[in-house]
Amino acid sequence: MTDLEYQDLAESALTAIETACDRINDETDADIDNQRTGGMITLTFSNRSQIIINLQKPLQEIWMAAKAGGFHYKFRGNQWLDTKDSSEFFTGLSRYASEQAGQPLVFNAPVPVTGK
């Protein structure tokens, strides 16, 4: 994967997270504060716990830090997969965010763009 392809895919993932936070805040009382600084998003929950997602450009990975631990994801096939257990990024984010928010939350992967 080229650096440009990585950047496009990673930025798409971060944008999907921001969009999901807006939707979740509109549809639930989760009240997630999401702040983006460059290639990093910090999600702060009402109990003040956080999930931090950041891009690791030299490794072409996305890293996530949650109360459950730290996780590294690499793009394989058509999704971001954990480098240790191959679990999907947005599935993990949904699980960890639900645990930290104390209610079920769903973060969806961006829809792939075809025809490029």
Swiss-Prot record:
It comes from Polaromonas sp. (strain JS666 / ATCC BAA-500). GO terms for cellular component: cytosol. Involved in iron-sulfur (Fe-S) cluster assembly. May act as a regulator of Fe-S biogenesis. Belongs to the frataxin family. It comes from the Bacteria. Signal peptide: none annotated. GO terms for biological process: iron-sulfur cluster assembly. The gene is cyaY. Keywords: Iron, Metal-binding. NCBIfam families: FeS_CyaY. This is Iron-sulfur cluster assembly protein CyaY. It holds the Pfam family Frataxin_Cyay. InterPro entries: CyaY, Frataxin/CyaY, Frataxin/CyaY_sf, Frataxin_CS. GO terms for molecular function: ferric iron binding; ferrous iron binding.
